[in-house]
């Protein structure tokens, strides 16, 4: 295992991405690392994803706005790989402003990012209702993300740059409703959408720019830049647990695709891995449990979705999935989060392999089943570890952790094959252990 420790001085452009089904603790990591950067840029997703951040005892919830907004010197970029519901962006911005956090002057929105219309939300609800009646519910957040990416691929979507040419934008909105909305009053709804976006245009027009060029020039100028991924790698549209995935590229390569970062840019990649597994909504979950361990993890980990308020499903850490995601992303270092949540468990299990239920063969390490049907052919193989009772939330030195906690961390580190440089031991952004 190569040990390449991260340094703000050496690694001026770096990336943070989740290694599971989201909710790994990326928001806390972004706020921690963005204190010393000039720019934080998001490259995928929309207001379906959420970060819950606790800074100096105050709780903040972010969906569209990058975590760098918590630091007054940081420019925050929404890249062209995102789909942006401007009304939700405004609401989020207003809440931050109430807490004394200025956003607008430090916000850059890609002119190539797609606008998520209210029509996309209506389409999403109708599609999920049809799937539910057919027994094929996906568990979408019902925020229009999938339909917006769909119209992007169908080349009927509307981009931020269109908003800067008002007559052109108004026509595109009306054409969009005519093509995609089977409502009797679609013309009236289209007009409402246009009028709503006129107000939003007045607020956000000055933020819309060529962010790809901005990013390239910033890299050339030697700016310190954090690239922020939404959702988690197991939700990637191509490599995740399809169809129970999101509609964008959530892997590290998405930073190049969704921000226009030059392909020769030296990006240091940081993976965020939670010490247990969680999932929101439908989809396969091989290591899920329903016993007292669930009660402990769900309660102590506050495992409730930031965007949907849905209670998260919980399970043991899945190393089959983690090794697979590490193979795809090649993270240089990993931030291992929420170790404090495991405190009090007598026994902690880790899934180390998948075993075929019929012939007992073990799935090759680094692989992950490509379909739900093939995944169901396997069962998890567990290895057990002793737990600990000591409160670790105030510990700042690695060697002060209980020996059993260190054994757990070091086993996972060896199996994943990347340096675990940071360990999260509490909710606050300052509750972190840095390993040499």
From Swiss-Prot:
Active-site residues, Swiss-Prot/TrEMBL: 23 (proton acceptor), 51 (proton donor)
Cofactor(s) demanded: Mg(2+)
Gene Ontology molecular functions: adenylosuccinate synthase activity; GTP binding; magnesium ion binding
GO cellular component, one term: cytoplasm
Catalyses which reaction(s): IMP + L-aspartate + GTP = N(6)-(1,2-dicarboxyethyl)-AMP + GDP + phosphate + 2 H(+)
Compartment annotation: Cytoplasm
EC number: 6.3.4.4
Keywords (A to Z) from UniProt: Cytoplasm, GTP-binding, Ligase, Magnesium, Metal-binding, Nucleotide-binding, Purine biosynthesis
Binding positions (Mg(2+)): 23, 50
Database matches in SMART domains: Adenylsucc_synt
Main location: cytoplasm
A Pfam short name: Adenylsucc_synt
Residues at which substrate binds: 306-312
Pathway: Purine metabolism; AMP biosynthesis via de novo pathway; AMP from IMP: step 1/2
Domain of life: Eukaryota
Enzyme's top EC category: ligase
SUPFAM superfamilies xref list: P-loop containing nucleoside triphosphate hydrolases
Residues holding IMP: 23-26, 48-51, 141, 155, 231, 246, 310
PANTHER family from the UniProt entry: ADENYLOSUCCINATE SYNTHETASE
Assembly behavior: Homodimer.
Misc: Parasitic protozoa lack the de novo purine biosynthesis pathway and rely exclusively on the salvage pathway for their purine nucleotide requirements.
HAMAP family recorded: Adenylosucc_synth
Function: Plays an important role in the salvage pathway for purine nucleotide biosynthesis. Catalyzes the first committed step in the biosynthesis of AMP from IMP.
NCBIfam families per record: PRK01117.1, purA
Similarity field: Belongs to the adenylosuccinate synthetase family.
Name of the protein this chain belongs to: Adenylosuccinate synthetase
Natural source organism: Babesia bovis
């Amino acid at each position: 295992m190569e040990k390449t420790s991260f340094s703000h001085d050496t690694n001026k452009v770096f990336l943070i991405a989740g290694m599971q089904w989201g909710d790994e603790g990326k928001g806390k990591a972004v706020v921690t690392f963005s204190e010393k950067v000039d720019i934080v840029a998001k490259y995928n997703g929309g207001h379906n994803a959420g970060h819950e951040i606790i800074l100096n005892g105050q709780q903040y919830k972010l969906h569209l706005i990058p975590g760098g907004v918590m630091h007054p010197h940081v420019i925050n970029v929404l890249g062209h790989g995102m789909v942006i519901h401007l009304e939700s962006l405004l609401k989020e911005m207003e809440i931050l402003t109430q807490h004394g956090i200025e956003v607008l002057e430090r916000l850059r929105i890609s002119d190539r990012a797609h606008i998520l219309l209210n029509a996309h939300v209506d389409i999403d609800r109708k599609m999920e209702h049809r799937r539910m009646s057919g027994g094929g519910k996906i568990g979408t957040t019902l925020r229009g993300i999938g339909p917006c990416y769909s119209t992007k691929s169908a080349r009927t979507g509307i981009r931020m740059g269109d908003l800067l040419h008002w007559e052109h934008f108004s026509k595109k909105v009306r054409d969009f409703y005519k093509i995609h909305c089977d409502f009797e009053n679609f013309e009236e709804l289209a007009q409402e959408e246009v009028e709503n976006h006129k107000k939003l245009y007045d607020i956000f027009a000055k933020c819309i720019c060529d962010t790809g060029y901005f990013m390239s020039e910033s890299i050339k100028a030697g700016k310190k830049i954090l690239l922020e991924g939404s959702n988690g790698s197991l939700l990637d549209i191509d490599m995740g647990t399809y169809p129970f995935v999101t509609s964008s590229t959530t892997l590290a390569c998405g930073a190049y695709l969704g921000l226009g970062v030059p392909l020769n840019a030296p990006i240091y990649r940081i993976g965020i891995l939670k010490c247990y597994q969680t999932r929101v909504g439908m989809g396969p979950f091989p290591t899920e449990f329903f016993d007292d361990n669930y009660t402990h993890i769900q309660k102590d980990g506050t495992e409730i979705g930031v965007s949907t308020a849905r209670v998260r499903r919980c399970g043991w850490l899945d190393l089959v999935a983690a090794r697979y995601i590490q193979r795809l992303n090649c993270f240089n270092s990993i931030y291992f989060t929420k170790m404090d949540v495991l405190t009090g468990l007598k026994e902690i299990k880790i899934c180390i392999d998948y075993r075929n239920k019929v012939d007992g063969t073990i799935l090759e390490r680094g692989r992950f089943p490509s379909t739900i049907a093939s995944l169901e052919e396997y069962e998890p193989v567990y290895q057990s570890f002793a737990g600990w009772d000591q409160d670790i939330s105030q510990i700042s030195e690695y060697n002060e952790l209980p020996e059993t906690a260190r054994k757990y961390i070091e086993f996972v580190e060896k199996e994943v094959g990347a340096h675990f440089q940071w360990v999260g031991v509490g909710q606050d952004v300052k509750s972190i252990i840095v390993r040499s």
